[in-house]
Amino acid sequence: MCIFCVLRPQPRCSWTSNRRKQYLRTMNGINDVNGSNGQQHYKPLEAQSIAQRQQEVWNVCRALKDRNELYGVLTRNSAIAMSGVPDPSMDSARTADGVPVVHVVVQTARNRRKGIPGVVAHVWKGLSEEHICHTQDGIDVLAPEPTWASMAETLSVDMLVELAESQMRHGRTTKEKLAVFLEGNSFRGRRKCQLALLLVESGSDSPKETELRLCLLSYGLSGFAVGYVVSGISFENGAAVTLDLADPELKIGIEYDGDHHRTDKMQWRRDVWKRRQLEVWDGRLSRSPNWICRMNRIVPRSP
């Protein structure tokens, strides 16, 4: 559900094992795994789904390695799952045994090994040691930047933006690191990644918020600040009141409310208090559960 509010002018003023912790430190230097993994931004069921997918892929890779059938470097959806980041493609490919398909990348076609069920090999001639993260268990995973790039063949530009912002939200990479990678590497879909990077912004709290911003942009509505802090009001604990998206010049604020805003009692109460504070400020508030869908029906997209 989305909330659209126009404000009056303002003054200008689970895995918990040591292996998982070591893996996350190796991947992106996160020391406080439990406090910095980005899962606090998702509703419980979504966070649980991400963690389960991560655990599943890890278990499959361990089993393949024990049978000496794991080779190359984890890439694409497998690398996304291992990093604990939401996968915008919602890939659910599984083997006949019901386990996730594992994607690996090798440098040349000669490095492919045939006849291993459940393993899909891709070739990237530019693969080098600097692109690989080594885990304590000996499972090699593409670093976040080439992982993002590897999805260019299957994701749309908007989905690449969602993936990049999710990686940034989880502390896996930065926009600057993605730009450096694009500048120094060649791969299929590079142009698509360059277009996506132009749209990437930091501060998004969820993939749905990214989707909302991109939806507005597709109608020519640009210039929205992400995570805008509303001046003059704050929560009882002193925390700032923010809006998912805002245009400070036009005094327009927009928020995306996921289902947990309805089902989580504490979140619901915070939302009610927040809306009342905005109304006290002479704000005008309207709510619609299908706001994006309605825009798609009644407003032509900009070319």
Predicted regions: what they are:
Residues M168-P303:
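Surface segments flanking catalytic/ligand-binding clefts of nucleic-acid enzymes
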Residues M1-F187:
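Short gly/ser-rich loop at a beta-strand->alpha-helix junction or flexible surface loop bordering the NTP-binding
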